[in-house]
């Protein structure tokens, strides 16, 4: 299942800011970048909305897999996991997260990816 719209991070400026972020946490198969919310980067209709959860995005490039089916399976797996982990966490409101999968992530078992996702959240101080 995909992330609900209230949890999705969208827009070129948001992604650019996250890529320049100094708060990066590296794992074997993915990188987590995080920043505090900056409403000026959001589209005008989203600026007035109150964030009740954190917003996150997932980047899975063609380097991970040339097959869209494989990339979409990874995306669905991680979206579902993040939704379950972060949906009820109101204490994280105002945090933006960007997960970028590394090229060799397609070779990892799904359980390994989910475990690494949890460990990166813990390292970032976002997991209880």
UniProtKB/Swiss-Prot annotation:
tRNA processing keyword on record: yes
InterPro entries membership: Ribosomal_Su5_D2-typ_SF, Ribsml_uS5_D2-typ_fold_subgr, RNase_P
Annotated EC: 3.1.26.5
Gene Ontology BP, a term: tRNA 5'-leader removal
Gene Ontology annotations for the cellular component aspect, listed alphabetically: ribonuclease P complex
Keyword match Nuclease: yes
Keyword vocabulary terms for this entry: Endonuclease, Hydrolase, Nuclease, RNA-binding, tRNA processing
Pfam families: Ribonuclease_P (PF00825)
One term of GO molecular function: tRNA binding
Domain of life: Bacteria
Reaction equation(s) it catalyzes: Endonucleolytic cleavage of RNA, removing 5'-extranucleotides from tRNA precursor
Enzyme class: hydrolase
Cystine pairs: none
Subunit and partners: Consists of a catalytic RNA component (M1 or rnpB) and a protein subunit.
Family the UniProt entry places it in: Belongs to the RnpA family.
Entry function: RNaseP catalyzes the removal of the 5'-leader sequence from pre-tRNA to produce the mature 5'-terminus. It can also cleave other RNA substrates such as 4.5S RNA. The protein component plays an auxiliary but essential role in vivo by binding to the 5'-leader sequence and broadening the substrate specificity of the ribozyme.
PANTHER family registered for this protein in UniProt: RIBONUCLEASE P PROTEIN COMPONENT
Protein name: Ribonuclease P protein component
Native source species: Synechococcus sp. (strain CC9902)
Gene behind the chain: rnpA
